[in-house]
Amino acid sequence: MASKPIVKWNTFVSAHQQFNERAHRYAYGKRGREGPFALSEAVRESLQDRSSLSLKATNARARIEFCRAARRIMRRIVKPTLDRPAYFLTLSPINFVTSAAEAETYDWSMLQKWAEEQLKGFCYFGIVDAAPYANTPRGREKVVSWHIHAIVWNASRDEMQALKDSINKRHQSLLPNRDAAHFRVRSSWKGLRQSLTYMLKAPLKTYRVYPIKDSNKRPTGEYRQKKDWHRSGEAAAVCRFMHGAEIDKLCVAGLEGREILKDVAARSVATIREQDATRVRALIRAVG
């Protein structure tokens, strides 16, 4: 699959299914079961279909149903227009970058608390995400950039710009030529739906950093990044550092967003229960 932005529903579903296949292939292969890079039984269990009811962050079915519920509920409540748009906000200060080893025990509630302080008084619904980097501007060190994606509404462009400027004055990003805070204006449901879909994906890609050079092939001090789908070992690393996380517990929300989060979590769990009951009834009919 080409590395396209995950903003369409079919792409979202297929990307999570492929992540699930890669993670399973590693988890139940020799490397995943034996030796220093083996996955624990608890990590493997999180990948199983039966773990979807717990909304495990690495569970493909849970991600799909959580996103499906969010798209339906947000469409009913958040109605962006040209005059009253919504915003897709990303917060990625370097303060919340950890080494790959530290990521396995990282307490992302620190990032959540920080984001909640920045967004006090705003209507928003967002989530903690993780971007694994195979290298950094400093060299071949593997790190994980923990960050927040959020949908913000009932705010003016001036308020959003002031928020962005305030954060960028106080915080740097992993890449020196990138802002720690940035946002995109969403004035239609189509654009907002795409941002919401992107926001709720699992960490599905690995990033690599490259120096930007001038016409004389000398480094400019700026960097660009590329991302591509995880290899099996990279997918396994995500399973390790996201182990124990539940999708709804990774979320952040303010004002009207709190009720949205509550409804999305409840609806996604209810849908999974209904699907399981339907499967059982079909099985009973088949053997009866």
Regions found by a protein language model. Give the residues of each.
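Right-hand nucleic-acid polymerase module
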Residues: 1-144, 154-288
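Acceptor-substrate binding/catalytic loop of class I
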Residues: 147
